[in-house]
Swiss-Prot record:
<dbReference type="GO" id="GO:0005576">
    <property type="term" value="C:extracellular region"/>
</dbReference>
<comment type="function">
    <text>Leech salivary gland peptide with unknown function.</text>
</comment>
<protein>
    <recommendedName>
        <fullName>Peptide HSTX-II</fullName>
    </recommendedName>
</protein>
<feature type="disulfide bond">
    <location>
        <begin position="32"/>
        <end position="42"/>
    </location>
</feature>
<feature type="propeptide">
    <location>
        <begin position="22"/>
        <end position="27"/>
    </location>
</feature>
<comment type="similarity">
    <text>Belongs to the annelide toxin family.</text>
</comment>
<keyword id="KW-0027">Amidation</keyword>
<feature type="modified residue" description="Phenylalanine amide">
    <location>
        <position position="46"/>
    </location>
</feature>
<keyword id="KW-0732">Signal</keyword>
<feature type="signal peptide">
    <location>
        <begin position="1"/>
        <end position="21"/>
    </location>
</feature>
<feature type="disulfide bond">
    <location>
        <begin position="26"/>
        <end position="37"/>
    </location>
</feature>
<keyword id="KW-1015">Disulfide bond</keyword>
<keyword id="KW-0964">Secreted</keyword>
């Protein structure tokens, strides 16, 4: 059970790291699937 929890925690950390790497990669609005690119970060477009 403890091994499973450690594995899940590691998987979550890897997913967050990959997500952050993708978020920081935007250079213009077309790089963000749904939102705007602001200073290299994809921000959600509200409204």
């Amino acid at each position: 059970m403890k091994t499973l929890l450690v594995f899940l925690l590691l998987a979550i950390l890897v997913a967050v790291f990959i997500g952050n790497a993708q978020v920081e990669a935007c250079k213009n609005h077309t790089d963000c699937l749904s939102g705007i690119c602001l200073k290299g970060f994809c921000m959600p477009a509200f409204g």
